[in-house]
Amino acid sequence: NVDSLYPIILRFPYPKAGTTNSAVKVGYVAASGGETTWIDLPGDPRQNYIMRMDFIPESNDLFIQQMNRPQNTNKVWIATIGGGAPKNILTETDAAWVETNYQVTWLKNNTYFTWQSERSGWRHLYRVSRDGKDVQPITKGEFDFIEQVGMDVKKGLVYFIASPDNYTQWYLYSAELLGKGEVKRLSPMDEQGQHRYDLSPDGKYAEHTFSNSVTPPRIEMVALPSHKTVSVIENNEEAASQYQQLQLSPKEFVKTRSGDLQLDAWMIKPVNFDPSKKYPVIIDVYGEPAGSTVQDVWQGGDLRHQYLANQGYIVVSIENRGAAAQTGREWTK
């Protein structure tokens, strides 16, 4: 739509319930232009999604993730440009649903790639051969691999976020790409809350941000894997001081039960709370997948919730099943 002087708007209506699904196909065209060549992926193009499509580095091969309509099967295909039929090298299935892999990294001259899976009951990182025949765990244990921060290929390390003991708090860990040894926590033990990292390309340094529900973000540059502070970018001391002066009601992290299921929650009580009295309760609900409301992270001091508590309400949020709570497949699904 950019061949002419002015671009042409193309409209694609989203299919409504009961109407025919849109057909999704994968094709390629030369950078210099020409005809589109379509890749013959098995399956009805109206009954499958193309979730991801990336070139494998230093090759003419496409790495394609194809998911069925119920979203409980993710098939990985490798298709060579001009090289015949695509090959299904890996299939991920689950009785409930599967996730798309957004952080595939290629290793060992592009002969292996990283893959996140819940096949063990917990979300972990795996090392998979290019033909899909060799699948080996990089991380192991009863915790969820939350996200990959980066790698130091020379040292053979992957840096990732996990929360083995308390999913409301996030910490940085490292593991050997060969899957040997134990995972190591790198975030400081005395900073309880959530740690976020932006890793340098060589994996030697990271911009580190720490916060929790009562601590505004503190940002620094650290060296890895020692986690030694190189420089402080922003400590937010003034914001922290002003917040403390407000003398707000504390945000309490608690656990409750729904039958046999244990649920995490937080609660903010009115100032001068009297346990002998009854109070109206407001429950803050999200209730959809891929989100989480019970997190020990700075959220602007929860001023909206604090205002409601100041008006005499108890404010509560309870994590529901299906949320991104990083507590294993059985609880989530």
Regions found by a protein language model. Name each.
Residues 1, 59, 187-188, 194-333:
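Serine-hydrolase catalytic core recognition
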Residues 1-205, 211-217, 221-222, 227:
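Beta-propeller folds
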